């Protein structure tokens, strides 16, 4: 291998949004993640909504009426002369 062209491969501290911290190796000194194996529903067996930037709230607000009729487009007004 050539000297000086490869990135520095070092120990990295990974911090999850739930507070879990672990170390691994990477070219970055620190990583911040939203979800890890300690809080992911697949690994914990608990149902948990992972809401990124309020997407669930936005969806519920958009479809709050809940009826199909409210989702249809309104009729166009008659043209006047």
Swiss-Prot record:
One GO term describing the cellular component: ribosome
Any one GO BP annotation for this protein: translation
SUPFAM superfamilies (alphabetical): L28p-like (SSF143800)
Cofactor note (record): Binds 1 zinc ion per subunit.
Record Pfam families: Ribosomal_L31 (PF01197)
InterPro entries, sorted: Ribosomal_bL28/bL31-like_sf (IPR034704), Ribosomal_bL31 (IPR002150), Ribosomal_bL31_A (IPR027491), Ribosomal_bL31_sf (IPR042105)
Keyword Lyase: no
Residues binding Zn(2+): 16, 18, 36, 39
Cofactor(s) named in the record: Zn(2+)
PROSITE patterns in alphabetical order: RIBOSOMAL_L31
Gene3D superfamilies per UniProt: Ribosomal protein L31
A GO MF label: metal ion binding
Keyword field: Metal-binding, Ribonucleoprotein, Ribosomal protein, RNA-binding, rRNA-binding, Zinc
Family: Belongs to the bacterial ribosomal protein bL31 family. Type A subfamily.
Protein name as catalogued: Large ribosomal subunit protein bL31
Higher taxonomy: Bacteria, Pseudomonadati, Planctomycetota, Planctomycetia, Pirellulales
Gene name as annotated: rpmE
């Amino acid at each position: 291998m050539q000297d000086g062209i490869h990135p520095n491969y070092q120990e990295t501290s990974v911090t999850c949004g739930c507070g879990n911290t672990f170390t691994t190796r990477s070219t970055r000194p620190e990583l911040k993640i939203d979800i890890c194996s300690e809080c992911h529903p697949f690994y914990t067996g608990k149902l948990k909504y992972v809401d990124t930037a309020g997407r669930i709230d936005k969806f519920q607000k958009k479809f709050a009426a809940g009826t199909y009729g409210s989702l249809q487009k309104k009729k166009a007004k008659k043209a006047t002369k």
